[in-house]
Structure formats: C-alpha cells, structure tokens
Amino acid sequence: MTSSKIEMPGEVKADPAALMASLHLLPSPTLNLEIKYTKIFINNEWQNSESGRIFPVYNPATGEQICDIQEADKVDTDKAVRAARLAFSLGSVWRRMDASERGHLLDKLADLVERDRAILATMESLNSGKPFLQAFYVDLQGVIKTLRYYAGWADKIHGMTIPVDGDYFTFTRHEPIGVCGQIIPWNFPLLMFAWKIAPALCCGNTVVIKPAEQTPLSALYMGALIKEAGFPPGVVNILPGFGPIVGAAIASHVGIDKIAFTGSTEVGKLIQEAAGRSNLKRVTLELGGKSPNIIFADADLDYAVEQAHQGVFFNQGQCCTAGSRIYVEESIYEEFVRKSVKRAKRKIVGSPFDPTTEQGPQIDKKQYNKILELIQSGITEGAKLECGGKGLGRKGFFIEPTVFSNVTDDMRIAKEEIFGPVQEILRFKTMDEVIERANNSDFGLVAAVFTNDINKALTVSSAMQAGTVWINCYNALNAQSPFGGSKSGNGREMGECGLREYSEVKTVTIKIPQENS
C-alpha cells in the first residue's frame, strides 16, 4: 500500500490520537517545493493578467513571501466568462459529452490528486499554515472523497414521468444551470475548491472560480490537474485576485448564471445584493458561525471535553463550524472547565511541518490582530481568562490556545465569530433555558449536544436553529450528507442535496393521440 492510498478512521478531525498513531505512515513533506503555477488559468491555458499586476503570497508560519501571483481583474473575469460560456454552448464537446464520461473525468481528477497528495498537502501547509499531518490525512482525504462521490452521481441524475390529466405525455429533465461563479475561502483552500467544482461539473455546468487571495496556490495547481485529466478548455477557469475586484465582478456579471460563496456574512450580503441587481442569478451562501455546543451532566465527561476541544481548536480555530459557545450544565461546570484548561495547555503549537504539531499559525496579521483584540475584549468585559490569551513570541502569526470561563451571553466573545483558537465556556441550568440561549444568535450553521439521554438529544436537536446538529460528536462532516446554514446563508452543499443547487428542472409535455393508463 502506498502512502497516498492510506485511509484513516472516521471522524479524524476529532481523533488526534488516530492521526498521531499513523505518523509512521505519513510521507515526508515535499522539500524545496517548486511553485510552478502562478498565472491565471483560462481556457486550459496559463495567462498573465491583462493589467500586468501581481500580488505577493506569504507563509503565515514565518511571515515570509512565497512567490508573486498574477492578479486578475474585471477584464480577466470577462475573458474567463467568455471561455466558460463557449464551453457550455450547445453542441460543444462538454455539452455533448456523456454523463458517464463526466463522472470518469472527475474520477481521473481524484486519481491525480491521490498521485500528488504529498505535494498538495505540502502546498496547503506552506500557504495556509495548517499542520501537514492534518492537510494530508484530513483535507486531502476530503478532496478525494468529494471528487469520487460526485463522479458516481454523474450518470444517475434523472427526471421522472408524470401522469398528467388529458392526452399528454409529460416528463422532467434535470439540466445544468450554465456558467457558475464560485468564490472560496482561505481556511480550507483545496477542500472548498473540491466542494464547489465537483457538484457543478457533475451536473454539466462550467465554472469560473476565485480562490482567496491569501491561499491561491493549491487551486492553481488543480488547474494543471484538471487539464491533465482531460476536461475540455473553458470548463474550469481559475482567477486569483481580490474580493472587491474579482469577487465583485463575478457576483455582478450577467454572463454568470449562478454564484456560490463561502465566507463572511458581511461579504455574503454584498454578493446576494449584486446577484439581484444584475441578472437575478441563483445564489448559494455558506456563511459564518458562532455554534453552540451543549454539554449535559449525563454526558461522558472526558469524551465531551476532548470533542469540545477539537470542535473549537481544529484548524487553528479557523472553522465556520467551530463550537465556540460551549454551554455546560451547572453541576459539572467547574470540572469541565478544569479539564478543558488542562487539555488546552497540552496542545502543541509549532511549525506546520513538525508531525507532532497540533496547531499552526493564524492565516495573516489582520486575523491575528482581530483575535487578540477580541481576547482583550473578553478580559475587559469580565470573563475569566483561564489560559493563553497572547501571541507567541516568534516569527509568524501564532496565538496561544486560549480558554475563557464565566462567559455570559452579552459579551463580544460570546456573540462574534472569532475564527481563532479561543474557547468560551458558559453555564446553564435547564434544557429549556439553554435551547433559548443557543438559538439567540445571528448565526445558525451547526450545533451539537452531548448527552446519554436520547430524549434530551432528540429534543435539543429538533429545537436547534441550525443546518446541522451533531449528537455526541463534532465536525462529523462527509461527502454524502448535506451541509449548510439555517440563518448562516442559504442552500446546501454536499450530498444529493448539493446537486439541486447546480441543476434546473425542465418540464416537457407532448400531445399524444390518446392517454392510456
């Protein structure tokens, strides 16, 4: 068995012991990684930006520049949209391709990702700061599984016949929408790339995708693999650049039929407005979170402590799903805090390429400063700082694992998305009380409950205003189940539901001489 074929146990995000036990199977990062792809990818060709502008990309673990990237703008966006529209035109190679062949291309792309898994994991660690161990076993495994899942769906998307009244024969077709604009974040650059393109291509659409300006490297590398896999020119186009320029151009472009965005709520609102003002393009938004994690006294305490820890600290706390509002039943509150602090103090913060590292740096100086400012607000507003709270005195953007107790619902750290390694622990007395408090938020992405009482589990899960609820687990995401928010955006990604966001249902009715049942 080669290292690129290693399959880890389920829930690897919440099982650091399983990751550490597999260190002997982990390949070495690619030393002196050559960054081959720094240009715009349009029509299966690498192109310089029309403006000639470039922008730097940095290593967040050191603060040092990695390389310069060609900066796309509105003119480049227009070129990419023209290429995508041509690839989607009637009679094109892509439109005439069998659905099974689309699935084969996605499978081939997954094969190529597996082949280059160590390179891509190295690139993710270098560019985003996440530990190489996580990038290889979690992120890249998720990419491969997503591509293979939607490869299997490609020739299984079908309509139905409908027994309508009268002498008619009626059936439905599920057709691709057209050109899809996609904007992805910096916290899971490659995984979000796969989440976006896989269902879109599975349904037969073409894509114009913008990676985050902080983390464009793995998306551009995927452009080379997409071409190698055999996707026709113009089917996938990749525009590195900045949100206010390229993102705004995609959102308002009348040649784009649908837009999908993962990122902040503030930007999501702007995208929805631009989509409405332009051509009423369809919009899928996966936005922020301030997710409640409810721990009842009858839960397995040590297990709940570890799951809650992983639920907020995974990926340096840079997760939209982070369970940052931890509500603990009063009778076990003090013990839960004590054990959580002990766990946080054990966390290993260091170089992403050290296999023992659990936490790397934050993405950039702006995010680093935002997190420290919110930590200070918690101290000022009266929460008890149990551990951490400071930046680490080294190069890069490292922050100590931080735990607050005696947090109340009105504090900024309990209301605002921190997107960093900060755990806030609140107390509650009754189930009805905690349900009301947990739902009293502008966010509604995910929630979790830990209890050994099935009645409590089902009552809380049905009451939560969230798109996903986990019972006695956290971050249990997979390709087969839908993901999206209740108040944090609209639409769903992943699973069969994700296909609906990238297809239109057409009704076809034929006049027939005589209806027969």
UniProtKB/Swiss-Prot annotation:
Its EC number is 1.2.1.36. Pfam families: Aldedh (PF00171). It catalyses: retinal + NAD(+) + H2O = retinoate + NADH + 2 H(+); all-trans-retinal + NAD(+) + H2O = all-trans-retinoate + NADH + 2 H(+); all-trans-13,14-dihydroretinal + NAD(+) + H2O = all-trans-13,14-dihydroretinoate + NADH + 2 H(+). Pathway: Cofactor metabolism; retinol metabolism. The active site is at residues 286, 320. InterPro entries: Ald_DH/histidinol_DH, Ald_DH_C, Ald_DH_CS_CYS, Ald_DH_CS_GLU, Ald_DH_N, Aldehyde_DH_dom. Expressed in the high vocal center (HVC) which integrates auditory and motor activities and constitutes a nodal nucleus on the song system. SUPFAM superfamilies: ALDH-like. GO terms for cellular component: cytoplasm. The record marks 187 as: Transition state stabilizer. GO terms for molecular function: retinal dehydrogenase activity. It comes from the Eukaryota. Keywords: Cytoplasm, Lipid metabolism, NAD, Oxidoreductase. Its main location: cytoplasm. NAD(+) binds at residues 184-186, 210-213, 264-266, 366-370, 417. One of its GO terms (biological process) is retinoic acid metabolic process. It is found in: Cytoplasm. PANTHER family: ALDEHYDE DEHYDROGENASE-RELATED (PTHR11699). Homotetramer. Catalyzes the NAD-dependent oxidation of aldehyde substrates, such as all-trans-retinal and all-trans-13,14-dihydroretinal, to their corresponding carboxylic acids, all-trans-retinoate and all-trans-13,14-dihydroretinoate, respectively. Retinoate signaling is critical for the transcriptional control of many genes, for instance it is crucial for initiation of meiosis in both male and female. Recognizes retinal as substrate, both in its free form and when bound to cellular retinol-binding protein. Lacks activity with benzaldehyde, acetaldehyde and octanal. Belongs to the aldehyde dehydrogenase family. This is Retinal dehydrogenase 2. It comes from Taeniopygia guttata (Zebra finch). The lineage of its organism: Eukaryota, Metazoa, Chordata, Craniata, Vertebrata.
